[in-house]
Amino acid sequence: MKSKFNSYTFYVDSTQQTINFDSLDEVNEYVCDITGVSQNQVVIVDDVEEKGHSNVTVKDKFGDKMRVVGFVYGSRW
């Protein structure tokens, strides 16, 4: 599925930084790097393509607790 966005901006809650990425996969990899979780523990809601934004959450190793680590939104520029 082709994305309707050219780039994605990720706002990191802990550092209050914004970082630009070319794809949601890159956002996912970055979240793994900064949190130490595996890719299947990162949750970026699929409705980014519809709504244009989503919270980014990570699951703990048991999958029962989730915490928000930031916010991502798409850009057409």
Model-inferred region functions:
Residues S3, Q17-F21, V56:
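Generic detection of short hydrophobic beta-strand segments and adjacent strand-loop junctions
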Residues M1-T15:
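Short aromatic-glycine-(Arg/Gly/Cys) micro-motifs in beta-strand/loop hairpins
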Residues V37-W77:
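Short, mixed-charge low-complexity intrinsically disordered segments
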